[in-house]
Protein backbone atom coordinates (compact mmCIF):
# COMPACT_ATOMS: atom_id res chain seq x y z
CA UNK A 1 0.00 0.00 0.00
CA UNK A 2 1.02 3.62 -0.51
CA UNK A 3 2.12 5.64 2.52
CA UNK A 4 2.69 9.40 2.80
CA UNK A 5 6.21 9.69 4.22
CA UNK A 6 7.87 12.84 5.54
CA UNK A 7 10.77 13.66 3.21
CA UNK A 8 11.71 17.11 4.56
CA UNK A 9 10.79 19.77 7.11
CA UNK A 10 11.40 23.51 7.49
CA UNK A 11 10.28 26.56 9.43
CA UNK A 12 10.45 30.34 9.44
CA UNK A 13 9.87 32.98 12.10
CA UNK A 14 9.61 36.78 11.92
CA UNK A 15 12.67 38.70 13.02
CA UNK A 16 10.95 40.61 15.83
CA UNK A 17 10.62 38.89 19.20
CA UNK A 18 8.02 40.31 21.59
CA UNK A 19 8.50 39.35 25.23
CA UNK A 20 5.78 39.43 27.87
CA UNK A 21 7.35 42.50 29.45
CA UNK A 22 6.82 44.38 26.18
CA UNK A 23 3.07 44.30 26.80
CA UNK A 24 3.32 46.17 30.07
CA UNK A 25 3.26 49.55 28.35
CA UNK A 26 0.35 48.56 26.10
CA UNK A 27 -2.18 46.79 28.34
CA UNK A 28 -2.63 45.98 32.01
CA UNK A 29 -0.70 42.74 32.40
CA UNK A 30 2.60 41.29 33.60
CA UNK A 31 5.05 38.56 32.70
CA UNK A 32 3.97 36.59 35.78
CA UNK A 33 0.26 36.82 34.87
CA UNK A 34 0.85 35.59 31.30
CA UNK A 35 3.25 32.77 32.21
CA UNK A 36 1.04 31.48 35.03
CA UNK A 37 -2.04 31.24 32.82
CA UNK A 38 -0.53 30.22 29.48
CA UNK A 39 3.12 29.19 29.77
CA UNK A 40 4.00 31.78 27.10
CA UNK A 41 7.13 33.90 27.61
CA UNK A 42 7.66 35.37 24.14
CA UNK A 43 6.38 35.25 20.57
CA UNK A 44 7.49 36.44 17.12
CA UNK A 45 5.58 39.30 15.48
CA UNK A 46 5.68 39.95 11.72
CA UNK A 47 7.16 43.23 10.55
CA UNK A 48 5.75 45.39 7.77
CA UNK A 49 7.84 43.50 5.21
CA UNK A 50 6.77 40.05 6.47
CA UNK A 51 3.53 38.34 5.43
CA UNK A 52 1.89 34.94 5.53
CA UNK A 53 3.17 34.34 2.00
CA UNK A 54 6.75 35.43 2.71
CA UNK A 55 6.95 33.33 5.89
CA UNK A 56 5.27 30.37 4.21
CA UNK A 57 7.65 30.61 1.26
CA UNK A 58 10.69 30.68 3.54
CA UNK A 59 9.49 27.61 5.46
CA UNK A 60 8.69 25.85 2.17
CA UNK A 61 12.16 26.52 0.75
CA UNK A 62 13.73 25.14 3.92
CA UNK A 63 11.58 21.98 3.77
CA UNK A 64 12.36 21.38 0.09
CA UNK A 65 16.08 21.86 0.71
CA UNK A 66 15.92 19.54 3.73
CA UNK A 67 14.26 16.95 1.49
CA UNK A 68 17.07 17.21 -1.06
CA UNK A 69 14.58 18.20 -3.75
CA UNK A 70 13.91 21.08 -6.13
CA UNK A 71 10.68 23.14 -6.08
CA UNK A 72 9.80 21.66 -9.47
CA UNK A 73 9.59 18.22 -7.82
CA UNK A 74 6.44 19.32 -5.95
CA UNK A 75 3.02 18.33 -7.37
CA UNK A 76 0.74 20.06 -4.84
CA UNK A 77 1.18 23.08 -2.58
CA UNK A 78 -1.28 22.95 0.30
CA UNK A 79 -1.37 25.91 2.70
CA UNK A 80 -3.22 25.94 6.01
CA UNK A 81 -3.91 29.54 7.07
CA UNK A 82 -6.58 31.83 8.47
CA UNK A 83 -4.61 34.96 7.60
CA UNK A 84 -4.08 34.90 3.81
CA UNK A 85 -2.40 37.77 2.00
CA UNK A 86 -5.54 38.38 -0.05
CA UNK A 87 -9.17 37.27 -0.13
CA UNK A 88 -8.17 35.71 -3.45
CA UNK A 89 -6.18 34.27 -5.07
CA UNK A 90 -5.19 31.62 -2.55
CA UNK A 91 -1.95 32.37 -0.75
CA UNK A 92 -0.82 28.85 -1.72
CA UNK A 93 -0.85 29.97 -5.35
CA UNK A 94 1.32 32.97 -4.43
CA UNK A 95 3.77 30.66 -2.64
CA UNK A 96 3.73 28.38 -5.68
CA UNK A 97 4.71 31.37 -7.82
CA UNK A 98 7.46 32.46 -5.41
CA UNK A 99 8.93 28.96 -5.55
CA UNK A 100 8.88 28.92 -9.35
CA UNK A 101 6.47 25.98 -9.59
CA UNK A 102 4.37 26.11 -12.76
CA UNK A 103 2.93 22.59 -12.82
CA UNK A 104 0.57 20.79 -10.49
CA UNK A 105 -1.89 22.69 -8.31
CA UNK A 106 -2.17 24.71 -5.11
CA UNK A 107 -4.89 25.76 -2.70
CA UNK A 108 -5.53 27.05 0.82
CA UNK A 109 -7.25 25.25 3.69
CA UNK A 110 -8.95 27.09 6.54
CA UNK A 111 -9.54 25.21 9.78
CA UNK A 112 -7.87 27.82 12.01
CA UNK A 113 -5.55 26.19 14.58
CA UNK A 114 -6.46 22.72 13.31
CA UNK A 115 -5.48 23.70 9.78
CA UNK A 116 -2.19 21.83 9.61
CA UNK A 117 -3.80 18.60 10.83
CA UNK A 118 -6.53 19.00 8.20
CA UNK A 119 -3.86 19.74 5.58
CA UNK A 120 -1.74 16.66 6.36
CA UNK A 121 -4.87 14.53 6.22
CA UNK A 122 -5.87 16.02 2.86
CA UNK A 123 -2.35 15.64 1.45
CA UNK A 124 -2.32 11.99 2.53
CA UNK A 125 -5.59 11.39 0.66
CA UNK A 126 -4.22 13.00 -2.53
CA UNK A 127 -1.06 10.90 -2.31
CA UNK A 128 -2.81 7.62 -1.60
CA UNK A 129 -5.34 8.42 -4.33
CA UNK A 130 -2.55 8.84 -6.87
CA UNK A 131 -3.21 12.50 -7.69
CA UNK A 132 0.11 13.70 -6.25
CA UNK A 133 3.47 12.10 -5.56
CA UNK A 134 4.98 14.91 -3.51
CA UNK A 135 2.97 17.44 -1.50
CA UNK A 136 4.29 20.56 0.17
CA UNK A 137 2.17 21.00 3.32
CA UNK A 138 2.52 24.44 4.90
CA UNK A 139 1.06 26.07 7.99
CA UNK A 140 1.64 29.84 7.98
CA UNK A 141 0.02 32.67 9.93
CA UNK A 142 0.27 36.36 10.75
CA UNK A 143 -2.29 36.36 13.56
CA UNK A 144 -0.87 39.62 14.91
CA UNK A 145 -2.78 41.32 12.07
CA UNK A 146 -6.19 40.24 13.40
CA UNK A 147 -5.64 40.84 17.12
CA UNK A 148 -7.33 43.50 19.22
CA UNK A 149 -4.30 44.94 20.96
CA UNK A 150 -6.51 46.40 23.69
CA UNK A 151 -7.85 42.97 24.68
CA UNK A 152 -5.41 41.51 27.18
CA UNK A 153 -7.17 38.14 27.18
CA UNK A 154 -6.23 37.48 23.54
CA UNK A 155 -3.42 39.74 22.33
CA UNK A 156 -0.84 38.14 24.64
CA UNK A 157 -1.57 34.64 23.34
CA UNK A 158 -0.70 34.70 19.66
CA UNK A 159 2.38 34.92 17.48
CA UNK A 160 3.35 34.68 13.82
CA UNK A 161 5.35 32.06 11.93
CA UNK A 162 5.37 29.20 9.45
CA UNK A 163 6.31 25.55 9.20
CA UNK A 164 6.29 23.10 6.30
CA UNK A 165 6.62 19.41 5.47
CA UNK A 166 7.27 17.61 2.21
CA UNK A 167 5.18 14.44 2.09
CA UNK A 168 6.15 11.84 -0.51
CA UNK A 169 4.51 8.65 -1.75
CA UNK A 170 6.34 5.50 -0.66
CA UNK A 171 5.48 1.81 -0.71
CA UNK A 172 4.46 0.42 2.67
CA UNK A 173 3.52 -2.99 4.02
CA UNK A 174 0.24 -1.98 5.63
CA UNK A 175 1.76 -2.32 9.08
CA UNK A 176 2.11 0.19 11.92
CA UNK A 177 5.87 -0.22 11.55
CA UNK A 178 5.62 1.53 8.15
CA UNK A 179 6.99 5.04 7.90
CA UNK A 180 4.45 7.74 7.05
CA UNK A 181 0.89 8.67 8.00
CA UNK A 182 -0.73 5.74 9.80
CA UNK A 183 -4.04 7.28 10.87
CA UNK A 184 -5.90 10.58 10.80
CA UNK A 185 -9.17 11.65 12.41
CA UNK A 186 -10.91 14.99 11.94
CA UNK A 187 -13.95 16.55 13.63
CA UNK A 188 -15.87 19.83 13.57
CA UNK A 189 -18.91 21.28 15.35
CA UNK A 190 -20.24 24.66 14.25
CA UNK A 191 -22.37 25.00 17.37
CA UNK A 192 -19.28 26.39 19.12
CA UNK A 193 -18.61 29.16 16.58
CA UNK A 194 -19.26 32.02 19.03
CA UNK A 195 -16.62 30.77 21.46
CA UNK A 196 -13.70 31.50 19.11
CA UNK A 197 -14.10 33.57 15.96
CA UNK A 198 -13.14 36.73 14.07
CA UNK A 199 -15.82 39.44 14.07
CA UNK A 200 -15.35 40.46 10.44
CA UNK A 201 -15.24 39.22 6.88
CA UNK A 202 -15.78 40.35 3.27
CA UNK A 203 -19.34 39.00 3.04
CA UNK A 204 -20.57 40.41 6.36
CA UNK A 205 -18.74 43.51 7.58
CA UNK A 206 -16.45 44.12 4.60
CA UNK A 207 -13.61 44.33 7.15
CA UNK A 208 -10.89 42.00 8.37
CA UNK A 209 -12.20 42.05 11.95
CA UNK A 210 -10.55 41.00 15.20
CA UNK A 211 -10.19 37.71 17.02
CA UNK A 212 -12.71 37.12 19.83
CA UNK A 213 -12.48 34.25 22.28
CA UNK A 214 -14.21 32.90 25.36
CA UNK A 215 -11.08 31.41 26.85
CA UNK A 216 -12.72 29.46 29.67
CA UNK A 217 -15.21 27.87 27.29
CA UNK A 218 -12.45 26.85 24.89
CA UNK A 219 -10.44 25.32 27.73
CA UNK A 220 -13.52 23.47 29.02
CA UNK A 221 -14.06 21.68 25.71
CA UNK A 222 -10.46 21.32 24.52
CA UNK A 223 -9.13 18.36 26.49
CA UNK A 224 -12.15 16.12 25.89
CA UNK A 225 -12.32 16.87 22.18
CA UNK A 226 -8.59 16.38 21.67
CA UNK A 227 -8.42 13.07 23.50
CA UNK A 228 -11.50 11.82 21.62
CA UNK A 229 -9.83 11.99 18.19
CA UNK A 230 -6.56 10.65 19.54
CA UNK A 231 -8.28 7.63 21.04
CA UNK A 232 -10.05 7.09 17.69
CA UNK A 233 -6.63 7.00 16.01
CA UNK A 234 -5.36 4.50 18.57
CA UNK A 235 -8.40 2.30 18.02
CA UNK A 236 -7.91 2.46 14.24
CA UNK A 237 -4.29 1.31 14.42
CA UNK A 238 -4.24 -0.86 17.52
CA UNK A 239 -1.54 1.38 18.97
CA UNK A 240 -1.62 2.87 22.47
CA UNK A 241 -0.25 5.88 24.31
CA UNK A 242 2.64 3.70 25.49
CA UNK A 243 3.75 3.25 21.87
CA UNK A 244 4.11 7.00 21.30
CA UNK A 245 7.67 8.31 21.11
CA UNK A 246 6.70 11.98 20.78
CA UNK A 247 3.48 13.90 21.38
CA UNK A 248 3.42 17.15 19.37
CA UNK A 249 0.26 19.04 20.33
CA UNK A 250 -1.09 22.36 19.14
CA UNK A 251 0.78 25.00 21.12
CA UNK A 252 -2.14 27.06 22.45
CA UNK A 253 -1.75 26.94 26.20
CA UNK A 254 0.53 24.88 28.41
CA UNK A 255 -2.31 24.03 30.78
CA UNK A 256 -4.28 22.43 27.93
CA UNK A 257 -1.18 20.56 26.75
CA UNK A 258 -0.43 19.26 30.25
CA UNK A 259 -4.05 18.23 30.89
CA UNK A 260 -4.28 16.40 27.55
CA UNK A 261 -1.02 14.51 28.11
CA UNK A 262 -2.12 13.55 31.62
CA UNK A 263 -5.51 12.25 30.44
CA UNK A 264 -3.79 10.18 27.74
CA UNK A 265 -1.11 8.93 30.17
CA UNK A 266 1.69 10.28 27.99
CA UNK A 267 4.83 10.99 30.00
CA UNK A 268 5.90 14.62 30.32
CA UNK A 269 9.26 13.82 28.76
CA UNK A 270 7.58 12.76 25.51
CA UNK A 271 5.70 16.04 25.04
CA UNK A 272 7.15 18.66 22.67
CA UNK A 273 6.44 22.15 24.02
CA UNK A 274 7.32 25.37 22.18
CA UNK A 275 4.43 27.56 23.32
CA UNK A 276 6.83 29.32 25.69
CA UNK A 277 8.85 30.75 22.78
CA UNK A 278 6.29 30.90 19.94
CA UNK A 279 2.94 31.56 21.60
CA UNK A 280 -0.08 30.29 19.69
CA UNK A 281 0.75 30.49 15.98
CA UNK A 282 -2.49 28.79 14.91
CA UNK A 283 -1.94 26.58 11.83
CA UNK A 284 1.84 27.11 12.08
CA UNK A 285 1.94 25.80 15.64
CA UNK A 286 2.33 22.06 15.03
CA UNK A 287 4.87 22.26 12.17
CA UNK A 288 6.95 24.79 14.11
CA UNK A 289 7.03 22.45 17.11
CA UNK A 290 7.85 19.50 14.84
CA UNK A 291 10.68 21.41 13.17
CA UNK A 292 12.10 22.36 16.56
CA UNK A 293 12.10 18.77 17.82
CA UNK A 294 13.66 17.46 14.60
CA UNK A 295 16.35 20.16 14.60
CA UNK A 296 17.40 19.49 18.20
CA UNK A 297 17.60 15.75 17.58
CA UNK A 298 14.64 14.56 19.61
CA UNK A 299 12.51 13.25 16.73
CA UNK A 300 14.41 10.65 14.69
CA UNK A 301 13.64 8.35 11.77
CA UNK A 302 11.34 5.55 12.86
CA UNK A 303 9.83 7.42 15.82
CA UNK A 304 6.06 7.23 16.30
CA UNK A 305 4.75 10.79 16.47
CA UNK A 306 1.29 11.91 17.57
CA UNK A 307 0.01 15.28 16.31
CA UNK A 308 -3.17 17.02 17.45
CA UNK A 309 -4.85 20.41 17.27
CA UNK A 310 -8.10 22.20 18.04
CA UNK A 311 -9.29 25.49 16.59
CA UNK A 312 -12.20 27.81 16.00
CA UNK A 313 -15.42 26.31 14.73
CA UNK A 314 -14.76 24.20 16.68
CA UNK A 315 -12.48 22.08 14.50
CA UNK A 316 -10.14 19.44 15.86
CA UNK A 317 -8.13 16.47 14.71
CA UNK A 318 -5.22 14.09 15.23
CA UNK A 319 -2.62 12.39 13.04
CA UNK A 320 -0.44 9.40 13.87
CA UNK A 321 2.70 9.11 11.76
CA UNK A 322 5.96 7.26 11.86
CA UNK A 323 8.86 9.59 11.11
UniProtKB/Swiss-Prot annotation:
The active site annotation covers 113, 250, 280
- Pathway involvement? Lipid metabolism; fatty acid biosynthesis
Its Gene Ontology cellular component terms are: cytoplasm
Q: Which Pfam families does the entry link to? A: ACP_syn_III, ACP_syn_III_C
InterPro entries, A to Z: ACP_syn_III_C (IPR013747), ACP_syn_III_N (IPR013751), FabH (IPR004655), Thiolase-like (IPR016039)
What keywords were assigned to this record? Acyltransferase, Cytoplasm, Fatty acid biosynthesis, Fatty acid metabolism, Lipid biosynthesis, Lipid metabolism, Multifunctional enzyme, Transferase
**Under the GO molecular function aspect, what terms does this record hold?**
3-oxoacyl-[acyl-carrier-protein] synthase activity; beta-ketoacyl-acyl-carrier-protein synthase III activity
According to its UniProt record, where is this protein located?
Answer: Cytoplasm
What does it catalyze? malonyl-[ACP] + acetyl-CoA + H(+) = 3-oxobutanoyl-[ACP] + CO2 + CoA
Q: What GO biological process terms are annotated to this protein in UniProt? A: fatty acid biosynthetic process
- The enzyme's first-digit EC class, named in words, is transferase
Q: Where is this region: ACP-binding?
A: 251-255
| Keyword set includes Transferase | yes
What is the UniProt domain comment for this protein?
A: The last Arg residue of the ACP-binding site is essential for the weak association between ACP/AcpP and FabH.
The job of this chain, per UniProt, is described as: Catalyzes the condensation reaction of fatty acid synthesis by the addition to an acyl acceptor of two carbons from malonyl-ACP. Catalyzes the first condensation reaction which initiates fatty acid synthesis and may therefore play a role in governing the total rate of fatty acid production. Possesses both acetoacetyl-ACP synthase and acetyl transacylase activities. Its substrate specificity determines the biosynthesis of branched-chain and/or straight-chain of fatty acids.
Per the record, the similarity remark reads: Belongs to the thiolase-like superfamily. FabH family.
Q: Which HAMAP family match?
A: FabH
Q: Which PANTHER family match?
A: 3-OXOACYL-[ACYL-CARRIER-PROTEIN] SYNTHASE, BETA-KETOACYL-[ACYL-CARRIER-PROTEIN] SYNTHASE III, CHLOROPLASTIC
Quaternary organization:
Homodimer.
What protein does this entry describe?
Answer: Beta-ketoacyl-[acyl-carrier-protein] synthase III
Q: Source species, please?
A: Brucella anthropi (strain ATCC 49188 / DSM 6882 / CCUG 24695 / JCM 21032 / LMG 3331 / NBRC 15819 / NCTC 12168 / Alc 37)
